[in-house]
Amino acid sequence: MRANSKAKPVSRAALAGEADPRLVALSVSIQDDGALYAEDIRGSQAHVSMLAAQGIVPKAAARRIVAALDQVRAEFAAGKIRFDPALEDVHTHVERRLGELVGKDAGYLHAGRSRNDQVALDERLFIVGACDRCDAALERLQRAFLGQARAHERTILPGYTHLQRAQPVSLAHHLLAYVEMFGRDRERFAEVRRRAAISPLGSGALAGTTLPLDREAVAARLGLAGVTHNSLDAVSDRDSAAELLFACALAAVHLSRIGEELVLWTTKEFGFATLSDAFATGSSLMPQKKNPDVGELARGRAGRALGDLVALLAILKGLPLSYNRDLQEDKRPLLGGPEALVLTADAVAGAVETATFHAARMEEALGSGEALATDAAEYLVDRGVPFREAHEAVGKAAAFSAREGRPMARLTAAEWATFHRRFEKDVLRCFDARRSLRRRELPGAPGPRAVRAELRRWEKALGKARR
């Protein structure tokens, strides 16, 4: 089904002749904003219903328009609307198809409305829905990490700084770090949603309208919290779009971090984890390969998310009030960013929840004892030694261990005593990783009780979210 494109576009009513084909080719946006058809139709239905309630259009005409727009929405969803470049954008496609269905009554629809406040509303409705979709995907991701964390409360491994073994932590504590990250991401999406959920309709092109619109009624019909307060700002404001893409970009950066760890941990060199075959790929040449593409794609998608954000900010930079056609270019990053995040989050969630973590290999990586050097320093601090002095003494022990080719855990009590007079026989207890964790029970620390408390807190939080 194709809307009639022979009629002169409404935006050229005061212009002579037809637009140059080169301008038309440059101006076409339907390939991008066509994805906004549902939001555009929803806004139009709320607008025309308000016009009827205000006595601006006949109620019977408004009812016909609302019913016909339901049909147009169904045709878009079924792929029956063929995009016509001559009609430029989604708004014109909807309006032309509406005209075919209800005739001249379609002309009532645009009373008191401009493309400028119309598209601003469409984007806000999209952003609200996108925030909900991203939040749901990140919640699924949190649940995947939480399930593995619960299964690995007693699994210990080296924690890393600078990708060097640093101190022992539990795998549960490590996985809960990602639950925290994605929790902050969800908070950001909630904040973006709250700021986006207001209606700009009634702002017109830039200066409102003389018609007696009920802006609050439209907002209420759309489930929005209120209306904008400055018409110039309302038609040119894309802050919520930028905030959405920032939230997507930061969540994608967090996904890239677990992506990198999946890549590292599944190497033979680390051997900490094995991906399910369902979340790995092979090689077209090397038959033995099992590649962690899910992690690599998560890393790569972060670059795309960052690019979307920078692209939008560059479009917005330096625009004078109010609306400028530059804003047409916001659709591609805005519409693609949230979808990419949801796809990536769901794939990573599947990879994490089906991965096998190798506890014995992780604990083996702690065997040499250097990850417990800080415990030896704090042993001295517990005995009244200033930390810097203790740090220096253990540093000398570490250097001696390296020269001798013996792990720190294998040094004798007598050897430890040569590095500081306060070292006694029980210093060797410092090199028990599980004992070390049991001594780290501050809130947020990796001690078993602290980790169990965090598991319970997140299980309660996500349980409430599910209800």
Swiss-Prot record:
Disulfide linkage: none
SUPFAM superfamilies linked: L-aspartase-like
InterPro entries listed in its UniProt record: Arg_succ_lyase_C (IPR029419), Argininosuccinate_lyase (IPR009049), Fumarase/histidase_N (IPR024083), Fumarate_lyase_CS (IPR020557), Fumarate_lyase_fam (IPR000362), Fumarate_lyase_N (IPR022761), L-Aspartase-like (IPR008948)
A biological process from GO: L-arginine biosynthetic process
EC number: 4.3.2.1
GO CC annotation: cytosol
Pathway: Amino-acid biosynthesis; L-arginine biosynthesis; L-arginine from L-ornithine and carbamoyl phosphate: step 3/3
Top EC class for this record: lyase
Alphabetic keyword roster: Amino-acid biosynthesis, Arginine biosynthesis, Cytoplasm, Lyase
Record's catalysed reaction(s): 2-(N(omega)-L-arginino)succinate = fumarate + L-arginine
Gene3D superfamilies named among the record's database cross-references: Fumarase/aspartase (C-terminal domain), Fumarase/aspartase (Central domain), Fumarase/aspartase (N-terminal domain)
A molecular function GO annotation: argininosuccinate lyase activity
Subcellular location: Cytoplasm
Similarity-based family: Belongs to the lyase 1 family. Argininosuccinate lyase subfamily.
Identification of the protein by name: Argininosuccinate lyase
Species per Swiss-Prot/TrEMBL record: Anaeromyxobacter dehalogenans (strain 2CP-1 / ATCC BAA-258)
